[in-house]
From Swiss-Prot:
The lineage of its organism: Bacteria, Bacillati, Bacillota, Clostridia, Thermoanaerobacterales. Keywords: Cytoplasm, Methylation, Protein biosynthesis. Belongs to the prokaryotic/mitochondrial release factor family. This is Peptide chain release factor 1. The modification N5-methylglutamine is found at Q232.
């Protein structure tokens, strides 16, 4: 690991010279590339330099242990203990910094919430999840925009697609993808029996046009009149848009906006995110095949989290975390769960990294 860190520091020194070179500064594209790389490794280099300074201090303090002055010797032993502790802490921090960054972590989010098994109760649960993520986004200072929705007559969602934008939105919300399960007594249940329903959450990184190129010949665009609840007409013009990506068969429908142009833009934005996610999954599937023996199949668990209303309990099955604060979680208090998932993810990645 030390060799790797030294190589990173050498590169950092080289980049520092490059970004100060007038010949390189005159080439804006090249200069920006070097500045970006310099910034990406700066935290590791500063932490490594701090680590090297602690090693020097340890060696200097060890020399004091041979002193005949008992008081000085005692102080040196105490100092050495603190330095060793600091060294171990810095090593752990450096290991975390060495974990390869997810290139999508800086992106915004397209989140799809769909009612699963459970009929109307599942649709109401999908609405609860929509509210939970909206409140979490508000706490984080992120912006939430409904891109598309399909509501039920009693206030549930068969499907809702959100655009969540703000610093750290994808890096934190990506852990929410999967099947969410609710256990509760529906308001319509006269016998008071507990029902189990599910909703699925998909978290996609929002991608720019430059990230995914869509060939105009590969898409079919249909326009139609948007409808309200129960099929009632809410618009007298053909403003709703259905985009079909012919090679993959992906269909995206948007009808929330009154303008056909806005609905078309939203539908294409969602399509780009879906195509990007598909390419990403294929890439990850190939990587997973080579690591299958070490880390399992790489497939997502069918059920990632359970929300149990009678017990006021939330359990995340991936990490075995249980909290008895159901209402707070549903009100957007998700940080404790997400922080634990991030730590678990980092631990798994460290386990599979070769730091020698």
């Amino acid at each position: 690991m030390i060799d790797k860190l030294q190589a990173i520091e050498d590169r950092y020194v080289d980049l520092s010279q490059k970004i100060s070179d007038p010949n390189i500064i005159s080439n804006v594209a090249e200069w920006r590339k070097y500045v970006k790389e310099h910034a990406a490794i700066e935290d590791i280099v500063l932490k490594y330099r701090e680590y090297k300074k602690v090693l020097e201090d340890i060696e200097a303090t060890k020399e004091l242990l041979s002193s005949n002055d008992e008081e000085l010797k005692e102080m040196a032993e105490e100092e050495l203990s603190q330095l060793e502790e600091k060294k171990e802490k810095l090593l752990e921090e450096i290991k975390i910094l060495l974990i390869p960054k997810d290139p999508n972590d800086e992106k915004n989010v397209i989140m799809e919430i769909r009612a699963g098994a459970g009929g109307e109760e599942a649709a109401l649960f999908a609405h609860d999840l929509f509210r939970m993520y909206s409140m979490y986004a508000e706490k984080k200072g992120w912006k939430v925009e409904i891109m598309s929705s399909n509501e039920t007559d009693i206030g549930g969602f068969k499907e809702v697609i959100l655009n969540i934008s703000g610093k750290g939105s994808y890096s934190r919300l990506k852990y929410e993808s999967g099947v969410h399960r609710v256990q509760r007594v529906p308001t319509t249940e006269a016998g008071g029996r507990i029902h189990t329903s599910t909703a699925t959450v998909a978290v996609l990184p929002e991608v720019e046009e430059v990230d995914v190129e869509i060939n105009p010949n590969d898409i079919k665009i249909d326009v139609f009149r948007s409808g309200g609840h129960g099929g009632q007409s809410v618009n007298t013009t053909d403003s709703a848009v259905r985009v079909t990506h012919i090679p993959t068969g992906i269909v995206v429908t948007c009808q929330d906006e009154r303008s056909q142009i806005q609905n078309r833009e939203r539908a294409l934005k969602i399509l780009r995110a879906k195509l990007y996610e598909m390419a990403l999954q294929e890439q990850q599937r190939e990587i997973a095949e080579t690591r299958k023996s070490q880390v399992g199949t790489g497939e997502r668990s069918e059920r990632i989290r359970t929300y149990n209303f009678p017990q006021g309990r939330v359990t995340d099955h991936r990490i075995g975390l249980t909290l008895y604060r159901l209402q707070e979680v549903l009100d957007g208090d998700l940080d404790e769960i997400i922080d634990a998932l991030i730590l678990n993810d980092q631990a798994e990645k460290l386990k599979n990294m070769n730091l020698n």
